[in-house]
From Swiss-Prot:
The chain crosses the membrane at residues 54-71. Residues 72-87 are mitochondrial intermembrane. The lineage of its organism: Eukaryota, Fungi, Dikarya, Ascomycota, Saccharomycotina. Keywords: Membrane, Mitochondrion, Mitochondrion outer membrane, Protein transport, Transmembrane, Transmembrane helix, Transport. It is a single-pass membrane protein. This is Mitochondrial import protein 2. Disruption phenotype: Causes severe growth phenotype and leads to reduced biogenesis of mitochondrial proteins and abnormal mitochondrial morphology. Compromises import of multispan mitochondrial outer membrane (MOM) proteins. Residues 1-53 are cytoplasmic. It comes from the Eukaryota. GO terms for biological process: mitochondrial outer membrane translocase complex assembly; protein insertion into mitochondrial outer membrane. Belongs to the MIM2 family. InterPro entries: Mim2 (IPR037652). Pfam families: Mim2. It comes from Saccharomyces cerevisiae (strain ATCC 204508 / S288c) (Baker's yeast).
Length: 87
């Protein structure tokens, strides 16, 4: 699933680069427009990398800790009910 998302992002980036190159060849973009589009593309890439890092943090750190906490709490509750019932 992540591979298809990465592939689509790469293809979108290639399409953007191709469209910018086509405009440069036609003389529609100046150097300022090109540098601005490059800066925007870099900012977009950094934003996507940040989102991926946050996603990994959530999936690999926070969710397991939350599951561990909830699991221990549930086990304590069930064990106390079990003991009360049989003791």
């Amino acid at each position: 699933m992540a591979d298809s998302e990465d592939t689509s992002v790469i293809l979108q980036g290639i399409d953007t680069i191709n469209s910018v190159e086509g405009l440069e060849e036609d003389g529609y973009l100046s150097d300022e427009d090109t540098s601005l589009s490059n800066e925007l593309a870099d900012a977009q890439r950094q934003w996507e990398e940040s989102l991926q890092q946050l996603n990994k943090l959530l999936n690999w750190v926070l969710l397991p800790l939350l599951g561990k906490y909830i699991g221990r709490r549930m086990a304590k509750t069930l064990w106390s009910r079990f003991i009360e019932h049989f003791v």
